[in-house]
Structures are given as C-alpha cells and as structure tokens.
Amino acid sequence: GLMAPTAMTINKEVVWRDNLYYLGVVVFLLVALALPFFSVPVENPEPNTQYWGMMVALLFIALYVIYVFLLHHSYKASLKNNQDSDVQESEEDDAEEEELEISSEPQAWGWIIGMMLLMGGASHVLVEAAIHLGDLAGIDAVIMGFVVIAAGTSVPDTVLSVISAKKGQYDAAISNVFGSNIFDICICLSFPILIALAMGGGPTPIVLPQIELIGSLIAATLVAFYFFRSGYELSKPESIILLGIYFLIVILSFTF
C-alpha cells in the first residue's frame, strides 16, 4: 500500500474470496493445533505435542484444492465479463501477448525451474542459519521461524506485490499476499507430513507453538478485512497501521 501511487482500490471479490479464505485457513490451523481430535495416538507422546498424520495433511490439501477451484471459477467469470471489452483494451492485450512471445516456452520453463531451485537452496540455508542463530541467542525456534524465516522466505512475494502495486494492479498485489500464505499453510505443512509417512517415519510431531502467535495472525487478518471492506480500498494511513501491527506482533512474539 505504501508503494502504490494512489490508494489501492480493491475488487470486492478479492476481499471476500482471498481475505476471508485466508482467515478461515488460519482459524482451521488454530483448531487443528488446539484439539486432540486431530492428533494421531502414539506410544509415549511428548508433552505439549500434537502428532499429525494423513487426515490433517489431506484436510489441508483439500482446503487448497477448494481455493484453487474458486480462483479458476473467478478466472472463467472474468473472461466471460471481458468478452465485450473495447478496442483499446484489445490492443493492449495484443501488445502484452507479443511481449510474452519474446521468450520461448522451454526458456521460460528453464527460468522458472532454475529460480525455484535457487530459492529452495537459499531457503534451506536461511532456515539452518536462523535456527543456529536462535540456539546461540537462546531464542525459541518457533519465534525464529515466525520472525526471521517467515520474513526471509516472503521476500519474493513482497517484491511481486510491490511491482504489482506500482503498476496499479492492486487486485494482483492483494491476491498474491493472501494466496501465498494460503499455499504456505495448506501445502507447506501437508506435504512434509505425507513425505514422512511415505518414508515410514510415522506421524509428524508438532510441538504446540505459542497460541498467541496464531491469534495475532487472526487479529491482523480481521483488521485488514475491515480496512479492505471499508470502501474497498487501502489508503496509505491504513497501510502504515498494518505495518505497525506487524512490528508490534514481532516485538510481542519475544514476550510470549
């Protein structure tokens, strides 16, 4: 919001689809962490620990599949609504298509796969360094993950959102923020569980984090929804407030 040339005007569908769906995913995460129903029975369980198995992983994947279906439905509806676009928009679309055809498909896939491998390797180094730093400083691994690792791995998402905001593509900027976080929770939690089960490792132990951190995510999402819902735009003062809430959560996380 701070990088946008004007107040960010947001489509109603983005607010009601992406924002609320992310809120629902975070609430489900909190429920899954809090209720023993989602924990797989094991012998000699560790205290304050949940054990997640196939059921939780499939539920998270199902949530993401539903979200992708909603995105696909919105995309098809958008195409139908844009069939009667004027000549100027058609010319702009043609120019964009010509620009995309500059690179061949194999070259594009090469860049995508290469960047994914690069970011994956960089993320691995970031995680190991952050955990080591937390051990040296006596900071809980959950806090390091919530603050340092989350911020570091979100840099690409932030760059994409900033670029979209500068271009006036506000819906894309907001959807990228919520969509990436939905992916992180639904897929990045479920796939390691499935991989561990496939390798015969049994249920994945989840040491219950500070519930206050999850609660802070819900509170921040509700504030964002209130701002987006009020006139369906995000002003610079509101952006400053959201940024302040983030720094407040970071500071408070060290006291939980």
Residue ranges of each PLM-predicted region?
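Hydrophobic alpha-helical segments, chiefly the membrane-spanning helices
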Residues: G1-F256
